[in-house]
């Protein structure tokens, strides 16, 4: 998913696609060790797949070739010359590269996660928030630096978890 946002915070364009040749070919990520209620459980993977099919049926998503996705990105880059950003941009670069989508077409980019770690992650009140809310890494039990944890600290703990559906993660 991609969202073009103006300097005033208004969404100018958005695009949500599932990659042709990949969607439905591979199972969605799931950890069989997790309980059914966990987001990354096998039960959740089935719910998430149903949700993707509902998005296709409603027109919220298309199934698009990497070439079509690249064309949309190229056009958006030509129209707006945006700064490419994402939370954990290196992850997105890698996933897109694996599907032959070139994010290197953008002349400016920065990683929101790196910025959040430098500005928010080092704050004592953020770290205490993570301990209080049990937003800790599994192995080392250190404060999480995830988009969810950061957003809950900034906006409030009542904020719903991100849906991990690319477009909504970027837009909402």
Residue locations for each model-derived region?
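Amphipathic alpha-helical interface surfaces
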Residues: 65-72, 92, 108, 112, ...
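Acidic, Mg2+-coordinating catalytic module of metal-dependent nucleases/exonucleases
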Residues: 83-84, 89-90, 94-98, 132-172
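Conserved non-catalytic scaffold segment of RNase H-like nuclease domains
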Residues: 1-99
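Short alpha-helix plus adjacent loop in nuclease-associated cores
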Residues: 112-138
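Conformational gate/switch positions in structured elements
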Residues: 30-33, 112, 170
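A short, structured active-site edge motif that brings together acidic residues
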Residues: 18-21, 106-120
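Short, surface-exposed basic-aromatic patches at helix termini and helix-loop junctions that form
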Residues: 99-105
């Amino acid at each position: 998913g991609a969202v073009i946002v103006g300097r005033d915070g208004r969404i100018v364009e958005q695009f949500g696609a599932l990659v042709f040749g990949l969607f439905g070919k591979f199972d969605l990520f799931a950890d069989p060790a997790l309980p059914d209620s966990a987001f990354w459980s096998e039960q959740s993977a089935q719910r998430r797949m149903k949700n993707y099919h509902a998005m296709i049926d409603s027109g919220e998503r298309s199934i698009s070739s990497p070439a079509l996705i690249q064309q949309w990105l190229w056009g958006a880059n030509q129209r707006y010359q945006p700064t490419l950003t994402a939370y954990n941009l290196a992850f997105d670069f890698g996933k897109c590269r694996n599907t032959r989508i070139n994010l290197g077409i953008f002349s400016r980019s920065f990683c929101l996660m790196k910025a959040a770690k430098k500005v928010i992650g080092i704050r004592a009140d953020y770290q205490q928030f993570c301990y209080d809310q049990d937003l800790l890494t599994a192995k080392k039990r250190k404060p999480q630096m995830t988009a969810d944890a950061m957003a809950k600290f900034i906006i409030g703990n009542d904020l719903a978890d991100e849906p991990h559906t690319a477009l909504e993660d970027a837009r909402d």
